[in-house]
A protein has these predicted regions:
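Active-site phosphate-binding strand-loop segment of PLP-dependent enzymes
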Residues: 23-72
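Active-site-proximal loop/turn and secondary-structure-junction residues that shape catalytic pockets
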Residues: 45, 74-76, 108
């Protein structure tokens, strides 16, 4: 919502299924019109931790020739390692032909300091729209790949350091531990009257 507000874009919020808390694909399909510029799915969404049917959203994107963004800000550093951790997931990423971009926050399950996030693009076609270039600045051409112009590199260096330290195996192990702990807590809650 923040980016849409900055850019003057109206968001059409698609209803979710009351039981699964996943986006209603039929409702999403009905809401697509000639002003639709993108479809977005959560993998997972923050309040309930459920993953939208990214395959279905990808199919809609292909059908209507619309880019599909996967918001994996919360779980991007978990779901990317689920298969290797022994918890297979349905495809949610660039394995799906309609997915054009994915976001992930490095400061959540990436274990990096707060202040950096990732946006990955299927191709440079969409990434090129992210850049801002102002050729008439008195100091020369001013270009920046983000809304924030000048940024300190410390957070990015710290993020890189954490990723190098943990490595793929570290993220796989963390994912396995988190999922197993979540399942143990879920089982324990089942035995507590009044909780579900």
């Amino acid at each position: 919502d923040k980016a849409a507000d900055l850019l003057g874009i109206r968001i059409s919020h698609v209803p979710v299924d009351e039981v699964t808390r996943r986006v209603d694909l039929r409702a999403m399909s009905r809401m697509i019109n000639n002003k639709t510029i993108m479809l977005v799915g959560s993998a997972p969404q923050f309040p309930h931790g459920t993953m939208d049917n990214i395959q279905g959203i990808s199919d809609l994107g292909l059908k209507y020739n619309l880019p599909v963004h996967v918001d994996a800000c919360l779980g991007g550093f978990l779901i990317a390692f689920m298969d290797d951790a022994g918890f297979p997931l349905k495809p949610f990423d660039f394995r799906l032909a309609g997915v054009t971009s994915i976001s992930a926050d490095t400061h959540k399950y990436g274990y990096a300091p707060k202040g950096s996030s990732l946006v990955l693009y299927r191709s440079s076609f969409y990434r090129n729209y992210q850049y801002f270039c102002y050729p008439d600045w008195p100091g020369g051409i001013y270009g920046t790949p983000t809304i924030t112009g000048s940024r300190a590199g410390g957070i990015i260096a710290a993020c890189w350091g954490v990723m190098k330290l943990l490595g793929r195996e570290g993220y796989v192990t963390a994912t396995r531990d988190i999922i197993n702990t979540t399942r143990r807590i879920t089982e324990a809650v089942q035995d507590v009257p009044g909780l579900k």
